[in-house]
């Protein structure tokens, strides 16, 4: 991809505004991923490699056993393949403990979780309107909100990382809503949190929902890491994942029409390349139609075959148990390295990565320098500045651990060449 973006080259005003705003932020990542030969170990991209041997075998069997001539046609169904929707319903009703049973009419499929969020924003917001995002938040929202829907993520700053899980976040939301320079239409959270990799407590989820009801906002809960929870005695609170689907909305005076949950196969099952996302909206038929219109033919029948096989598989409970065990072991391996070199980190138990505070990085420039030193050693990590954390919290990085054990060990060996001489 050319780095010369000085001239619009006949783009629409809308298209050029998006390119001009985003390319300077992502050109280095684009260049890195475009290399034909790349010996760097990527601990910056949140992908789960830990179940892939089992999943490869399961997906091969699915294609071998279940691929039929009909799968070469456009997918049937308005909001997704009917068999896939049934499998999703079975999955949500088993693992998300919904207060209201999930039915096929509540679902709309899309090619990935970000596509689900995009279709929600397209139907919730007009161009130029905003969505509240408590920081730190996943930096993919920065361009994912803007590319098609032209929606602005509105940072809600907090004094410390821990404040994300206290009542202080509600006060911060109220203040940001009051001073926002644009109309605010929704609040979005990732639960489990990205990049902090812990779960929100149920009482705080209820507070978020009441805040949205008070201000007539939509509530979007991105629950893409819902089943990537593992045991960690370092995490004293918020051990268990609680889905927004599980909350009795009527009992707290919240209209279910404003609540939307997003999930995909990407993280819990390590299938980010399959592009299989789904939105659950249980009491808003108009929204469900809008979501289906936006993405009803964009999911692959081949991916659907594999998803149906996996979600309905009798092996699913054991696969989830293996995933949790392997995540726990990988987390211990990485954090033992952190402890050895005095690297502080945010204790995690729900996700694929650790948010770690790099040593000798007290400014944004020093953070960038520390990231570049690791890159020079052959390890890519994701700099904390991109996640919009507190101004007082400089020098952080999100570091993936959900890779094959031998790859993680090699990454640690490379990182030791940096930290052993500091």
What are these model-predicted stretches?
Residues 4-112, 163, 168, 311-312, ...:
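N-terminal small-domain helix-loop-helix segment of the aminotransferase-like
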Residues 40-42, 262, 344-349:
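Short beta-strand
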Residues 69-214, 220, 226-253:
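Conserved core of the PLP fold type I
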Residues 90, 98-101, 254-255, 281, ...:
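PLP-dependent enzyme catalytic core of the Aspartate aminotransferase-like
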Residues 214-215, 341, 377, 422:
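Helix C-cap/helix->beta junction micro-motif
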Residues 324-335, 339, 344-358:
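Conserved glycine-rich beta-strand-loop-beta hairpin in the small C-terminal domain of fold type I
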């Amino acid at each position: 991809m050319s780095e010369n973006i000085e001239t619009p080259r006949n783009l629409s005003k809308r298209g050029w505004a998006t390119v001009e705003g985003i390319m300077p932020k992502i050109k280095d990542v684009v260049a890195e991923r475009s290399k034909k030969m790349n010996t760097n170990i990527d601990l910056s991209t949140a992908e789960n490699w830990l179940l892939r041997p089992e999943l490869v075998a399961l997906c091969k069997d699915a294609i071998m056993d279940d691929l039929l001539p009909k799968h070469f046609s456009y997918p049937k169904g308005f909001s997704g393949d009917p068999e896939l929707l049934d499998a999703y319903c079975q999955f949500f009703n088993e693992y998300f403990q919904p207060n209201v049973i999930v039915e096929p009419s509540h679902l709309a499929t899309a090619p990935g979780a970000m596509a689900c969020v995009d279709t929600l924003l397209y139907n919730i917001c007009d161009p130029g309107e905003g969505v509240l995002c408590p920081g730190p938040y996943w930096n993919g929202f920065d361009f994912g909100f803007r590319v098609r829907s032209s929606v602005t993520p509105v940072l809600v700053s907090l004094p410390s990382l821990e404040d994300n899980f206290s009542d202080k976040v509600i006060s911060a939301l109220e203040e940001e809503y009051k001073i926002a320079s644009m109309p605010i239409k929704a609040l979005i959270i990732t639960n489990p949190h990205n990049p902090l990799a812990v779960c929100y407590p149920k009482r705080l989820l209820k507070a978020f929902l009441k805040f949205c009801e008070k201000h007539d906002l939509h509530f979007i809960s991105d629950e893409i890491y819902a089943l990537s929870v593992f045991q960690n005695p370092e995490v004293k609170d918020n051990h268990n994942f609680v889905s927004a689907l599980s909350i009795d909305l009527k009992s707290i005076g919240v209209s279910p029409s404003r609540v939307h949950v997003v999930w995909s196969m990407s993280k819990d099952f390590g299938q980010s390349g399959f592009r299989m996302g789904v939105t659950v909206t249980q009491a808003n038929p108009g929204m469900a139609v809008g979501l289906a219109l936006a993405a009803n033919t964009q999911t692959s029948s081949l991916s659907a075959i594999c998803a149906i096989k996996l979600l309905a598989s009798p092996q699913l409970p054991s696969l989830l148990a293996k995933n949790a065990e392997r995540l726990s072991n990988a987390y211990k391996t990485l954090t033992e390295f952190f402890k050895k070199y005095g690297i502080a980190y945010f204790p995690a138990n729900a996700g694929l990565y650790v948010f770690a505070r790099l040593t000798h990085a007290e400014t944004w420039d020093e953070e960038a320098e520390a990231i570049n030193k690791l890159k020079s050693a052959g390890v890519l990590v994701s700099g904390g500045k991109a996640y919009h954390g507190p101004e007082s919290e400089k020098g952080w990085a999100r570091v993936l651990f959900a890779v094959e054990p031998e790859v993680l060990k090699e990454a640690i060996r490379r990182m030791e060449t940096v930290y052993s001489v500091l």
